[in-house]
Curated annotation (Swiss-Prot):
Domain of life according to the entry: Eukaryota
UniProt-recorded name of the protein: Cytochrome b
Gene Ontology CC: mitochondrial inner membrane; respiratory chain complex III
Taxonomic path: Eukaryota, Fungi, Dikarya, Ascomycota, Pezizomycotina
Source species: Epidermophyton floccosum
Compartment(s) where it occurs, according to its Swiss-Prot or TrEMBL record: Mitochondrion inner membrane
Length: 400
C-alpha cells in the first residue's frame, strides 16, 4: 500500500515490519522476538487493568486481590493471564538468550543489541520482584524482607539504604506504595528499551542466521513470509498459555502466597518465583552475605562481558564441537541451579550449590576464552594442512 511508504509514522512500520529484509535461512529459533513482544503487550494490558482494582495498602492489598478474583468481571482470567504470562515471558527470554549464546549473536557488529538486551533482562528481573510483592501474601512479605535486606551488605550505608527503600523500619504501607508505583512504571520503560533493542538490531546489519555468515546475499521481505511464520508460533504459544491459564493456573506459583501476610510468622521456606531460582541459589550457596550479593548480581551482569570474552574467529558454536559440549554442560548446570534454589539451605544442597556456582562463572571467565583460543589454533592447523594438501595435488598434476 502506498500510504505505508508515504506516511511519516507508517513508513517506520513499513521499514521495520513489512519490507525489512531478512536472511532466507532463519529457523523457528528466530521467532522468540515476536513472542516476547506479545508477552510484553499482554503484561501491559492486563497489568493496567489489574491496577484499576488493586489497593496498595498492607491491610487491603490481599483483600483487593480476592476482590479481583471473585467480584470483578473476568478478574480471575486477567490475573491468571498476568501471572502465567510472566512465567512464559522469562521462559522465552531464557531461550532467546540461549539461542544468542549458541549462535554468537553477541559478537560484533551486534554488541550494542546484546548489551541493550541484557539491560532489558535486568529490568525484567526488577519488575518481576516488585510484582511478586504486591499480592501481599506470606511469600510476598518475606520475599520482600529478605531481598531488600541484601542491600544491608553494602558497607556503611547499607542499613540506611534498606530503611530508605522500606520507608520505615520494616516492610509497610510506604514500601508497598513504592513497589506498586515502580512495578507500574517499569513495563513502559521496558517497552522503550525493546524499541531501542529493535533499532540497534536493524540499524546495524539486521538479524543473524544459523550459518553465522553474512545474510546480505539472499534476503526476503519480512511480510508476508516471516510474518506468517511468526503467526504459527504465536498461535502455538497462545494454545499452551491457555492450557496453563484455564487448567492449571497455580502450577507455577507458591501456595504460601494464598495465606495473608503475617509478619509474626515466617514461612517454612522463602523462595522466589521459579525463573529467579538460579540466581537465588548462587546467593544462598555463599556463606558470606556481601560476596553472595555480589555474585548474584554478577551472574546477570557477566552476560554483558560475553562479546569481550569470546575470542573465536567463527561466529557461534554450531561448528565448534568443544564449545558445543561446554554449552550443553552450562545449560544443564543452569537447570541444576534452578532446582537447588528451591531446596532448603542444608547439606548436601549447599555444597552442590557452591560447585554449580563455580561452574557457572568458570564457563564465562575460563572455558569460553580458553576454548575459543584452542579452536582458533585447531582451525589454523586444519586450514594450513588443507592448503598444503591442495598445493601438493596441483604440483603432482603439473608434473604429470
Amino acid at each position: 500500500m502506498r500510504i505505508f511508504k508515504s506516511h511519516p509514522l507508517l513508513k517506520l512500520v513499513n521499514s521495520y515490519i513489512i519490507d525489512s529484509p531478512q536472511p532466507t535461512n532463519l529457523s523457528y529459533l528466530w521467532n522468540f522476538g515476536s513472542l516476547l513482544a506479545l508477552c510484553l503487550g499482554i503484561q501491559i494490558v492486563t497489568g493496567v487493568t489489574l491496577a484499576m482494582h488493586y489497593t496498595p495498602n498492607v491491610l487491603d492489598a490481599f483483600d483487593s486481590i480476592e476482590h479481583i478474583m471473585r467480584d470483578v468481571n473476568n478478574g480471575w482470567l486477567i490475573r491468571y493471564l498476568h501471572s502465567n504470562t510472566a512465567s512464559a515471558f522469562f521462559f522465552l527470554v531464557y531461550l532467546h538468550i540461549g539461542r544468542g549464546i549458541y549462535y554468537g549473536s553477541y559478537q560484533g557488529p551486534r554488541t550494542l543489541t546484546w548489551s541493550i538486551g541484557t539491560i532489558i533482562f535486568i529490568a525484567m528481573v526488577a519488575t518481576a520482584f516488585l510484582g511478586y510483592v504486591l499480592p501481599y501474601g506470606q511469600m510476598s512479605l518475606w520475599g520482600a524482607t529478605v531481598i531488600t535486606n541484601l542491600l544491608s551488605a553494602i558497607p556503611w550505608i547499607g542499613q540506611d539504604l534498606v530503611e530508605f527503600i522500606w520507608g520505615g523500619f520494616s516492610v509497610n504501607n510506604a514500601t508497598l506504595n513504592r513497589f506498586f508505583s515502580l512495578h507500574f512504571l517499569l513495563p513502559f520503560i521496558l517497552a522503550a528499551l525493546v524499541l531501542m533493542h529493535l533499532i540497534a538490531l536493524h540499524d546495524t546489519v539486521g538479524s543473524s542466521n544459523p550459518l553465522g555468515i553474512s545474510g546480505n546475499y539472499d534476503r526476503l521481505p519480512f511480510a508476508p513470509y516471516y510474518l506468517f511464520k511468526d503467526l504459527v508460533t504465536i498461535f502455538l504459544f497462545m494454545l499452551i498459555l491457555s492450557i496453563f491459564v484455564f487448567f492449571m493456573p497455580n502450577a507455577l506459583g507458591d501456595c504460601e502466597n494464598y495465606v495473608m501476610a503475617n509478619p509474626m510468622q515466617t514461612p517454612p521456606a522463602i523462595v522466589p518465583e521459579w525463573y529467579l531460582l538460579p540466581f537465588y541459589a548462587i546467593l544462598r550457596s555463599i556463606p558470606d552475605k556481601a560476596v553472595g550479593v555480589v555474585l548474584m548480581f554478577g551472574a546477570i551482569l557477566i552476560i554483558l562481558a560475553l562479546p569481550y570474552l569470546d575470542k573465536s574467529i567463527l561466529r557461534g558454536i554450531q561448528y565448534r564441537p568443544l564449545s558445543k559440549v561446554a554449552f550443553y554442560i552450562f545449560v544443564a548446570n543452569f537447570l541444576v541451579l534452578m532446582q537447588l534454589g528451591a531446596k532448603h539451605v542444608e547439606d548436601p544442597f549447599i555444597v552442590f550449590g557452591q560447585l554449580s556456582t563455580i561452574l557457572y562463572f568458570s564457563y564465562f571467565i575460563i572455558i569460553i576464552p580458553l576454548l575459543s583460543l584452542i579452536e582458533n589454533e585447531l582451525l589454523d592447523i586444519a586450514t594450513n594442512y588443507s592448503s598444503n594438501k591442495t598445493l601438493k595435488n596441483r604440483k603432482s598434476l603439473l608434473s604429470e
